[in-house]
Design a protein with these regions (language model features):
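Short, solvent-exposed segments of well-ordered alpha helices
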Residues: 69-76, 164, 171, 303, ...
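Soluble extracellular-acting proteins and domains
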Residues: 718-829
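Hydrophobic, helix-prone linear segments
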Residues: 33-43, 51-53, 113, 120, ...
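All-alpha RGS (Regulator of G-protein Signaling) helical domain and cognate RGS-like helical scaffolds
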Residues: 36-226
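Generic L/I/V-rich hydrophobic alpha-helical segments across diverse proteins
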Residues: 82, 89, 105, 112, ...
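Bacterial N-terminal signal peptides
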Residues: 19-32
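Feature marking well-ordered beta-strand scaffolds used for ligand recognition
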Residues: 226-755
C-alpha cells in the first residue's frame, strides 16, 4: 500500500508519528509489565439472543476507535468535493487571461490533486472503499454536499469568458472552499471523530488553508468590482476615500484623553507563545503557518480600557458623543460644525447617551465599570464598587457635569430608550436593555441567572426605569416585565429559542434580550430589535409594554436596531451578524445576511417587504455590518442614513418598501492593510441639515448631502427646516423617534413639486406657474406680506383626482396643496 501514498502522506506521517514514537518508547521504559490471567471475552446479543464468546483479536477490532465511520464518509465526500474544484480550475486556461486567476487556479489544481491522493491513500491503507469521483454516482452525490456548484452553474462557468468567467469562478470557488470548512466542522461535531492524528492534522489544514484562500479570492473579486468603494487604500488618518452625493465638511480626531497616543488604532497584541512557536518552527526549518486575518484578530489580546466612540444625542446647539471611556460635549456652530466644550472620563462601556432637559442619561454594561467612575476597574466577582446600569448626569453647567443618579441593573445597560417625560409629576420613563452577564446575587439582590424552572431569572426581560427630574438620586427600576413570555403558558422563553432555520440559514441568537427598543410615542408603539426576533410593542401604558406582533428572518443572526419612517407606518430592522467586529460585507457574503429588513405596518402587523445591504464589497480587514442610523426628514419620502462600521455611510431611499435604493455614500479604506481592527462608523445621524458620524477609532465626521439625480436642492433645504411635532423643538435621542413636521415655506413646496415632476405626475406649465409665485414669497414676507400674492397662491387647487396615481403621489399633492395654503395664510397682512 505504500506505493499508493504520495509525498504529502509521508510528511503527515513524519511530523506526527515521530513525536508519538518517542512518547511510546518512553512509556515502555516507565510502565512495568503486568501478568493478566485468561478470562472469557463475551459479547451479549440483542434482548433474547445468546451471548457469544470472542477471541482477543476480534475484541480489539470491535473496540478499535482509531477512526470512525464519520471519518471514512468525510474522506470519501471530500474526494468528490475536491474533484469538482479541479474541474473548475482546469476551465481557467481556455476561459481567461487574467494572470491572478490563472495563478490561483494553478495552485488549487496542484493542492487539491495532492490532497485527493492523500485521502485515497488514507482510505486504501484502512481497506475502505475509495470512490471514483468521475463516476455517475459521484456526480449525483455531489449535489447534496455543502458548497458544491450545481450542474447548471458548472455549465455556465464552462461557457463564460474573460471577466464573466473570473467573477463566476471566484464566487463559486469561495462557496466551494467555505463548504469544505463547514464539512470539517460537521465532522468534528461527531463523537470520536478526527481521533486519528493524521486525519486531525489534515482537517485542521483544510480549515486554515481554505480560510486563507477565501480571503485571497475575496480580494481578487473586489478588484473586479466597478464600485469606487472597493479596494480603497488603508490608513488610520490618511485612508483613501470614496464619496457620492455627499460633502465631507470636517473630520475631527478624538479629544485628548480619549485615545492611547502609543496605540491610537487600538491594535491588539499577539499571544506571546504564538511568537515563540513561530520562531521555533522557523529554526526547525518548517514553513511558517499562515492563518486567516479573522483568525489572527480572534487570537489577539486587548487592554482593559477601551476608547471606542459610540452613540450620540442632540439638544439645541449641543452634541454629546458617547464612548466606552466616557463622553464628550460639543457646541454646534451655525454651519453645523462641533466645537469641544467638555470631556468626561467615566469608563464602563458602551456609553450610549440620551438628553432630557439638563439631564444626560448614560448606559454602562461592562464589569469594569465603577460607581465612582474610577479607571482601575473591579477585579473581584462581587463588589459594591462595581457599577452596571444607568448613570444620570446633571449638565446644566456644560463645563462641569456632575453624576447625580445611578440605577444598578442585573445585566447592566447596553442601550436605553427615553419613552416619555418629563411628565406633569416630573418623571422620566426609560426602557433599559441589558445584554451582559447576570450579576452575582451577593452584589445585587434578585439577580438570578438562567436556573431551570426559576421564573425570577434576569433573562428574558427589559427594565422600566423611573427618573425623578427634581431628585435623580431617587431613580429606580419600577418593573422588569417578561416581554417575551408565551401569553398562554407563561413560559418566559416564549419566542425564538436559538439555532438555525434549516439549510442555508443563519444561526439566530435566542430571544432573551432586546438590543434596541425604538419608541414612537405619538402612535403609542415601539419596535424592539430583540436578538432573535423583531417585535412591535403597544406602549399605550408606557410602564407595561406588551407585544402586538413578532417576526423572524432566516437571514438574521442578531436583531440589533429598529427605525420607523416618519409616519410610523414602516420599520427598518438591522441584523448585526458577526457582532460588529467581523468582516461581513465581503464580496461573497449573502446579501440578506447582516442587512436591513424593511417591514410595512399593516393593521398592526409587520409585513416583510425587502432587504437592503450596502452594495460595495469590503476587504477582510474591514469590519462591516448594518448598524445605527436615522431618518433624513425629506418631506414626502422615506430616506435613511446609516452606519456600516468600516463599510462607511450609506444613504437609502425606501419610499418604495419593495425596492430600496442607495442614493449617496461615503467610505474610507481599512485602518490597517493586513490586520482586522474594529473601526468605522458606530452611529450616523441627521440633525438640522447636517450628518454626524461617530468613527469608532478615528473621531467624529461631519457631512452634508448635496443635490443629485436622486435628491434635489429643494428637498435638501426642506429637510433642514424639519422640526419635531411634539416635545422639545430642537432635540434628537437615538431610540426615541418623534415625527417631524415642516413649516409652510417655499422650500418645502418646491420639494413636493420636484418629486411630482420626477414622477411625471404634474405638468411642467403648472409647476412653473407655482414656482414663479413662490419665488416672490421671501421678499414679500420680509416686507410684511402681500394680500395680492396671497390670493394668487391660494387659487392653485391641486389634486390627484382624475390621475391614475398611487397613494404616495396622492399624498404629495395633498401636502403641496396644504403647504401652499399655509404660505398664502402667512402672506396676508
Amino acid at each position: 500500500m505504500r506505493e499508493s501514498l504520495n509525498n504529502s502522506t509521508y510528511i503527515y506521517l513524519f511530523r506526527t508519528f515521530s513525536k508519538i514514537t518517542i512518547i511510546i518508547l518512553l512509556s515502555g521504559l516507565l510502565i512495568p509489565s503486568v501478568s493478566v490471567s485468561e478470562v472469557p471475552i463475551l459479547q451479549p446479543g440483542a434482548p433474547g439472543n445468546p451471548t457469544r464468546e470472542l477471541d482477543a483479536e476480534t475484541a480489539v477490532n470491535i473496540a478499535n476507535s482509531s477512526y470512525t465511520g464519520a471519518d471514512v464518509e468525510f474522506m470519501k465526500d471530500m474526494i468528490i468535493h475536491h474533484h469538482q474544484a479541479l474541474l473548475m480550475s482546469r476551465l481557467a486556461i481556455p476561459s481567461t487571461n487574467n494572470q491572478a486567476i490563472l495563478d490561483l487556479a494553478g495552485r488549487i489544481d496542484v493542492s487539491q490533486e495532492d490532497e485527493i491522493s492523500f485521502m485515497q491513500g488514507w482510505l486504501q491503507e484502512r481497506e475502505e472503499q475509495v470512490p471514483d469521483p468521475t463516476s455517475k454516482h459521484s456526480e449525483h452525490t455531489h449535489h447534496t454536499m455543502i458548497g458544491m456548484a450545481t450542474t447548471e452553474q458548472m455549465t455556465q462557468l464552462a461557457e463564460s469568458k474573460s471577466t464573466d468567467y473570473d467573477q463566476l469562478f471566484l464566487s463559486l470557488m469561495i462557496a466551494h472552499h467555505d463548504g469544505a470548512i463547514k464539512m470539517v466542522k460537521e465532522l468534528r461535531d461527531q463523537p470520536g471523530s478526527t481521533y486519528d492524528p493524521i486525519l486531525n492534522k489534515f482537517a485542521s489544514d483544510i480549515t486554515n488553508d481554505q480560510a486563507v484562500e477565501i480571503e485571497r479570492m475575496n480580494s481578487l473579486l473586489i478588484g473586479l468590482s466597478s464600485d469606487p468603494r472597493a479596494g480603497l487604500a488603508s490608513g488610520l488618518y490618511d485612508a483613501e476615500e470614496a464619496i457620492m452625493n455627499m460633502q465631507l465638511l470636517e473630520s475631527q480626531r478624538k479629544p485628548m484623553g480619549f485615545y492611547d497616543p502609543a496605540n491610537p488604532a487600538e491594535r491588539g497584541a499577539e499571544e506571546p507563545d504564538e511568537n515563540t512557536e513561530r520562531e521555533e518552527e522557523s529554526i526547525e526549518g518548517d514553513e511558517e503557518e499562515i492563518t486567516s486575518i479573522e483568525e489572527d484578530a480572534k487570537n489577539r489580546r486587548y487592554p482593559m480600557l477601551s476608547f471606542s466612540n459610540t452613540d450620540m444625542a442632540f439638544r439645541d446647539d449641543i452634541l454629546v458623543t458617547g464612548s466606552y471611556h466616557g463622553f464628550n460635549i460639543y457646541s454646534i456652530s451655525e454651519e453645523g460644525l462641533p466645537e469641544l466644550i467638555t470631556s468626561v472620563i467615566c469608563p464602563g462601556g458602551q456609553g450610549d447617551v440620551s438628553l432630557v432637559g439638563d439631564l444626560l442619561i448614560y448606559s454602562v454594561e461592562e464589569t469594569r465599570g465603577r460607581l465612582d467612575c474610577g479607571l482601575e476597574g473591579v477585579i473581584v466577582d462581587a463588589s459594591l464598587d462595581r457599577f452596571r446600569g444607568l448613570r444620570i448626569f446633571d449638565i446644566s453647567d456644560l463645563s462641569r457635569p456632575k453624576q447625580v443618579g445611578a440605577v444598578q441593573t442585573c445585566r447592566g445597560s447596553h442601550t436605553h430608550s427615553v419613552v416619555s417625560g418629563p411628565s406633569p409629576n416630573g418623571k422620566i420613563l426609560v426602557y433599559n436593555s441589558g445584554t451582559g452577564s447576570v450579576r452575582e446575587e451577593e452584589e445585587l439582590e434578585q439577580c438570578i441567572e438562567d436556573i431551570p424552572g426559576d421564573d425570577r431569572t434576569a433573562l428574558f426581560r427589559i427594565d422600566v426605569i423611573e427618573i425623578p427630574v427634581d431628585d435623580p438620586s431617587q431613580s429606580r427600576i419600577i418593573d422588569s416585565p417578561a416581554v417575551f413570555a408565551d401569553p398562554e403558558t407563561g413560559v418566559l422563553a416564549g419566542l425564538w429559542r436559538g439555532g438555525d432555520h434549516g439549510d442555508d440559514s443563519q444561526e439566530t441568537y435566542i430571544t432573551d434580550q432586546c438590543h434596541d427598543i425604538t419608541v414612537f410615542p405619538s402612535a403609542n408603539i415601539a419596535a424592539g430589535a430583540c436578538s432573535g426576533n423583531g417585535i412591535l410593542f403597544d406602549i399605550t401604558d408606557p410602564s407595561k409594554p406588551h407585544r402586538i406582533d413578532v417576526v423572524t428572518d432566516s437571514g438574521f443572526a442578531y436583531w440589533h436596531s429598529a427605525t420607523f419612517n416618519n409616519e410610523g407606518t414602516k420599520v427598518l430592522f438591522t441584523d448585526e451578524w458577526g457582532g460588529g467586529g467581523r468582516a461581513r460585507c465581503r464580496a461573497w457574503d449573502p446579501v440578506n445576511w447582516g442587512a436591513d429588513a424593511i417591514y410595512d405596518i399593516v393593521d398592526e402587523k409587520l409585513e416583510f417587504r425587502s432587504h437592503y445591504k450596502m452594495p460595495a464589497p469590503q476587504l477582510e480587514t474591514e469590519n462591516c455590518v448594518a448598524h445605527n442610523g436615522s431618518i433624513v426628514p425629506v418631506p414626502g419620502r422615506d430616506i435613511f442614513v446609516q452606519a456600516w462600521y468600516q463599510g462607511g455611510i450609506s444613504v437609502i431611499d425606501f419610499t418604495d418598501s419593495l425596492n430600496p435604493i442607495e442614493i449617496a455614500y461615503f467610505d474610507r479604506g481599512p485602518i490597517m492593510e493586513d490586520e482586522l481592527i474594529t473601526g468605522g462608523y458606530w452611529s450616523v445621524y441627521y440633525y438640522e441639515g447636517t450628518i454626524y458620524g461617530t468613527e469608532i477609532t478615528r473621531g467624529l465626521d461631519i457631512l452634508k448631502l448635496i443635490p443629485s439625480e436622486y435628491l434635489s436642492e429643494n428637498e435638501i433645504a426642506a429637510a433642514a427646516l424639519a422640526y419635531p411635532m411634539i416635545g422639545h423643538r430642537r432635540a434628537f435621542n437615538p431610540q426615541q423617534q418623534v415625527p417631524m413636521d415642516w413649516p409652510a415655506t417655499p422650500e418645502v413646496a418646491r420639494a413636493y413639486i420636484d418629486q411630482l415632476l420626477r414622477d411625471k405626475a404634474i405638468d411642467t406649465d403648472t409647476a412653473d406657474q407655482i414656482i414663479e409665485k413662490l419665488d416672490q414669497v421671501t421678499i414679500e414676507m420680509e416686507m410684511g406680506g402681500n394680500n395680492r400674492l396671497s390670493r394668487q397662491i391660494n387659487r392653485f387647487s391641486l389634486s390627484a383626482e382624475g390621475l391614475n396615481a398611487d397613494v404616495q403621489t396622492k399624498n404629495r399633492f395633498e401636502r403641496l396643496d396644504a403647504t401652499l395654503k399655509g404660505i398664502s395664510d402667512g402672506l396676508r397682512k
